[in-house]
Amino acid sequence: MHSLRKTAARLGDMLLESDPLDLVIRATLLLLVGMPSILGVEWQYQLIIRSLAVIGILAPAAGRSAAFWWAMATIFFVKSVDHWWIQDNHVFLLNWWCLTLAIALSTADPRRIIAANARLLIGLSFIFAVLWKGFLSPDYMRGDYFHFTFLTDSRVSGIGTLLCGMDPLQYRHNYDAMGLLASYKAEVQSVQLEGTPVLRMLAVVVTWWTVLIEGALALLFLLPSKFRVTRGRNAALLLFAWTTYLAMPIVTFGWTLITLGLAQCDDGARRTRLCFILTYPLLLAYLLAPIWPMLNRAASALLAGSLGGAH
């Protein structure tokens, strides 16, 4: 155990002693290589972008070249124009990020430009999210989006089972109903989904929590650093990542935000930088580990033990 702790400490020191600019570039390249779903389903663009990213990892000098990132940004731009109507929003964000790296690496002070623009991209992402959700989508503010998601998305069924009294039969009914509605063979115009009042209440709570924390993040990252309140921006972004993606493991967007968060960290903020680095495997654990089923089994066992003890 002692040797394991020693190895982990040494690994942490190696990461923290890395050049911050190199760390950000490697994190971006790993994001592009390790998350194919972030690039969409078009194999041509995946092949080019991921191959370039592999080259950037294996040849660090290429990854620090402005020409490399101009090429990457150009490919992303062509992809965005070619498939704008089906492209996820985080791909547009990555397009801007590659352009940021290209411009920054063309200057004498790339670290400062990267940090400032990463902060700006985070703030703008959240302010536009709040604008769309809070002011332009009244159905969202009623909780309809999360209510529908909690009823029909298998990724969050564990939350409904553990916290809201949903059972597997209700979810199976909802999945079958949505499949029937989507089938071109069925002449069905509407279906009735099964839920619970607690699930509806949770949807409203999550809706307002999302708008509030995203609004706070927009404020923290767009305000100039001279305001004392901005000292909490990193903690707020980490809190958002640790809580949001536990409930909804959208790791692609989560890793993108964490990469931007890492990029805007002050060079002397070693502990904060380490927290951002450790968030990468944490979000991966959210995606791969059956966390909610394990919690459900633990809760069931605890309840059974309590009932047994009562008798």
What feature does the model see in each segment?
Residues 112-119, 268-281:
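Membrane-interfacial entry segments at the cytosolic side of transmembrane helices
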Residues 249-277, 290:
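Hydrophobic alpha-helical segments
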Residues 276-294:
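Final/C-terminal transmembrane alpha-helix of multipass membrane proteins
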Residues 26-36, 44-76, 99, 117-133, ...:
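Functionalized membrane-embedded alpha-helices
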